[in-house]
């Protein structure tokens, strides 16, 4: 009560220019050991400055855009004394005991000490017309401080910065050493009191000027000497910017602004500063800000357009892919092969984990492929190899080969590996062919022949191997276990056949077995009817198994429970769109049948007996007639060169009746096309390229017409018999057509010799020079 009366009797500073408010002013003196000077100026909006003395009536001008970082926010003395608004030492009163260092935790009490506008005469704050109640020690301290200020030195209420490194922000004091510029020194000399007219805004502004390059003779410049203090970061950030939770908003306030609103905002602000969660958030945000504050003047922020954030995300993803953290090996190629900018960044970061320095190209490629299986579409794999080529050039800058040349060699090595070690029967690529295929592909120049020979021999002696995915390995092992115990119902493998090394069609190993027995094979022609070299024409005995649309040639006797070896898979032959006929023009051996495949390879097989030969011919042709899918239309082009259309290797989805109608339609189409082709013959005896193309097309149409005639005859017979028993079908054909049911001119064989069928003259062997 006595305190309220005393406050009401004391006039406040600036009553002459400000109307009294309806609400009583709270005591702004020292509470809980916290000085009242500093936070008022730092928390108010720009332009709202306190008046030091009645004599100092001129408001110091200040740029509102200037951000001040170093202020004396509150000076707490360990001996129980505090500095007043005029830098005077305040006496220790009973109300302020006990002194505590962490005044920010007491939000309500501390908020009342932030505004020194309402002076308390009992504390000796030099209100207008009030007696000075300071003791001799206070007066002596002020004289010492004034002499230090006039000499241009600096003063801090703390002897050291140890108090600012406390772990708890609420228990730490904040102090900043502001430089004393000539302007501030002049005001200090002209002012009757040492602290009068020393506006906080001016201190901040001049402090920034001093930090930017003031005269070093007048004191050391301000360089954020306490930037490591989290308490300073929190309070300075609170005073500089609006809070995201709405506690503080910057608004234009002049000297006559609403102080009640300021005091309420200050209470909220200080209470929020005492919240540990909020302080942590502010500290984190301030640490993020400090990283950008370290940039040189005029430098652009790297996070302005998000480039650095995207780059960091790409690096994190690449590191996880390389160390397989949350990813499998099969996921690597899928991530690196995408066609977008982020995937290219990820690929570049991923390749940075590899060091190809000093390695040969094939050695670097082997190292790279051991990290993950290179899977996906052709364009996806090509993108991955592009990133590999770029990284190889970065690690070997002294290599004279360009990046495009390295990429060309890399793709060539991949194709060479498939050609030399793939499951294809065709002729392997020679070293001379490998060199010829790369002519003038090194930016218009040729690669060094020694380099190409070295790469060829390396791939030939040791094939490229890449990592096996763990899931695929476990799946394969589980299939083997299921097969051993009879639990596996269906197994699938991939048979790589033909001249195209990228054509791999899954075939069910548990498909129906139509025939098996001993056959002796001779390769007569390779792909496209090219004559097989003499070194590979020899006869070899196999145990043949016709399972589904695949003719497996095994070295050992057939056993249903035995898995196929790699050599057995290499010798496998597809019989889709194939035609088996009796090789009547081959007189060196008896009981020989000829098999011509969809890619025009020709094989000769010798059976143990005539009956076995006829049975093999019937069953191969019947399987091809039932399961061969309809052919695609031929390509349309203005070129005169004839190209055979590709025949699908997949199984047809048509039923047998629909399949029969499809064959009949195709036969009519071929018959009409052959008739039209023969209407425009070329002169005989001409050996021009045009004549060769004419004869090749006629030979193709004749063979296709004979093949479909055979398919139609056998499929119609099967439908008529109404049974899947092949022995009954063979007996039916033997009854209708005599001893050689498969050699009727109009059905099975386009390769009949003259006089084989009595009373009829056959045409020349439709296979022409292939036999």
Curated annotation (Swiss-Prot):
It is found in: Cell membrane; Cell projection, Ruffle membrane; Cleavage furrow. GO terms for cellular component: cleavage furrow; dendrite; glutamatergic synapse; neuronal cell body; postsynapse; ruffle membrane. Residues 651-680 form a coiled coil. Residues 748-761 have a biased composition (Polar residues). Residues 257-266 have a biased composition (Acidic residues). PROSITE patterns: PH_DOMAIN, SEC7. Residues 260-462 form the SEC7 domain. Residues 47-66 have a biased composition (Basic and acidic residues). One of its GO terms (molecular function) is phospholipid binding. Keywords: Cell membrane, Cell projection, Coiled coil, Membrane, Phosphoprotein, Transmembrane, Transmembrane helix. Residues 1-67, 107-136, 207-230, 244-307, 739-771 are annotated as: Disordered. Residues 218-230, 288-299 have a biased composition (Low complexity). The keyword Cell inner membrane does not apply. Residues 512-625 form the PH domain. It comes from the Eukaryota. The modification Phosphoserine is found at residue 191. It is a single-pass membrane protein. The chain crosses the membrane at residues 622-639. One of its GO terms (biological process) is regulation of ARF protein signal transduction. Pfam families: PH_9 (PF15410), Sec7 (PF01369). Its main location: membrane. Belongs to the PSD family. This is PH and SEC7 domain-containing protein 2. It comes from Homo sapiens.
């Amino acid at each position: 009560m006595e305190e309220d009366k005393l406050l009401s009797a004391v006039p406040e500073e600036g009553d002459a220019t400000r109307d009294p408010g309806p609400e009583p002013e709270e005591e702004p003196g020292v509470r809980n050991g916290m000085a009242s000077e500093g936070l008022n100026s730092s928390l108010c909006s720009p332009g709202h400055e306190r008046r030091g003395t009645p004599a100092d009536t001129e408001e110091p001008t200040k740029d509102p855009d200037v951000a001040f970082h170093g202020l004396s926010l509150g000076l707490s003395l360990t001996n129980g004394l505090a500095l007043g608004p005029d830098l005077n030492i305040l006496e220790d009163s009973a109300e302020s005991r006990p002194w505590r260092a962490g005044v920010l935790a007491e939000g309500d009490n501390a908020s009342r000490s932030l505004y020194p506008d309402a002076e308390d005469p009992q504390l000796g704050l030099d209100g207008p017309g009030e007696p000075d109640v300071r003791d001799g020690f206070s007066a002596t301290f002020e004289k010492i401080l004034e002499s230090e200020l006039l000499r241009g030195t600096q003063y801090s209420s703390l002897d050291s910065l140890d108090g600012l490194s406390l772990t708890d922000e609420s228990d730490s004091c904040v102090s900043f050493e502001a430089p004393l510029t000539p302007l501030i020194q002049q005001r200090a000399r002209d002012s009757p009191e040492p602290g009068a007219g020393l506006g906080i805004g001016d201190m901040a502004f001049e402090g920034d000027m001093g930090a930017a390059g003031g005269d070093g003779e007048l004191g050391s410049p301000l360089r954020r000497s306490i930037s490591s203090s989290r308490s300073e970061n929190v309070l300075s950030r609170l005073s500089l910017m609006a809070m995201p939770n709405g506690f503080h908003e910057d608004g234009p306030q002049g000297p006559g602004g609403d102080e009640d609103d300021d005091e309420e905002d200050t209470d909220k602000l200080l209470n929020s500063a005492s919240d540990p969660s909020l302080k942590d958030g502010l500290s984190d945000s301030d640490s993020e800000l400090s990283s950008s504050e370290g940039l040189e003047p005029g430098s652009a922020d790297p996070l302005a357009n998000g480039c650095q954030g995207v780059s960091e995300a790409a690096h994190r993803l690449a590191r996880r892919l390389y160390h397989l953290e949350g990813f499998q090996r099969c996921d690597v190629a899928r991530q690196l092969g995408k066609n977008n900018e982020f995937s290219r960044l990820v690929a570049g970061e991923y390749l940075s984990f590899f060091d190809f320095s000093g390695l040969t190209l094939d050695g670097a490629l082997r190292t790279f492929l051991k990290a993950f299986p290179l899977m996906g579409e052709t364009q996806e794999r090509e993108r991955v190899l592009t990133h590999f080529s770029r990284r190889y050039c970065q690690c070997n800058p002294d290599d004279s080969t360009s990046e495009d040349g390295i990429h060309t060699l890399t793709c060539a090595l991949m194709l060479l590996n498939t050609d030399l070690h793939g499951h294809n029967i065709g002729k392997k690529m020679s070293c001379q062919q490998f060199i010829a295929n790369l002519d003038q592909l090194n930016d218009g120049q040729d690669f060094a022949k020694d380099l190409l020979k070295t790469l060829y021999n390396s791939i030939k002696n040791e094939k490229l191997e890449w990592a096996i995915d763990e899931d695929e390995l476990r799946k394969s092992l589980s299939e083997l276990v299921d097969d051993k115990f009879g639990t596996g119902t269906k197994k699938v493998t991939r048979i790589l056949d033909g001249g195209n090394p990228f054509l791999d069609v899954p075939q069910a190993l548990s498909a129906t077995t139509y025939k098996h027995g001993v056959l002796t094979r001779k390769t007569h022609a390779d792909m496209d009817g090219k004559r097989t070299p003499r070194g590979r024409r020899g006869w070899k005995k196999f145990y043949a198994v016709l399972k589904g649309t695949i003719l497996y040639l095994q070295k050992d006797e057939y056993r249903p429970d035995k898995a196929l070896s790699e050599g057995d898979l290499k010798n496998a032959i597809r019989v889709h769109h194939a035609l088996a006929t009796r090789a009547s023009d081959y007189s060196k051996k008896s009981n020989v049948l000829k098999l011509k495949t969809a890619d025009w390879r020709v094989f000769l097989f010798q059976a143990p007996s005539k009956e076995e030969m006829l049975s093999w011919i019937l069953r191969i042709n019947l399987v091809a007639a039932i399961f061969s899918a309809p052919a695609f239309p031929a390509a349309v082009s203005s070129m005169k060169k004839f190209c055979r259309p590709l025949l699908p290797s997949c199984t047809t989805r048509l039923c047998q009746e629909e399949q029969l109608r499809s064959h009949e339609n195709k036969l009519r189409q071929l018959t009409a096309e052959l008739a039209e082709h023969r209407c425009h013959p070329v002169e005989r005896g001409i050996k021009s390229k045009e004549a060769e193309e004419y004869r090749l097309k006629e030979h193709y149409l004749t063979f296709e017409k004979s093949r479909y005639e055979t398919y139609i005859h056998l499929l119609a017979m099967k439908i008529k018999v109404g049974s899947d028993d092949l022995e009954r079908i063979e007996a039916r054909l033997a009854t209708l057509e005599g001893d050689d049911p498969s050699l009727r001119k109009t059905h099975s064989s386009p390769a009949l010799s003259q006089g084989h069928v009595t009373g009829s003259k056959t045409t020349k062997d439709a296979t022409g020079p292939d036999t």
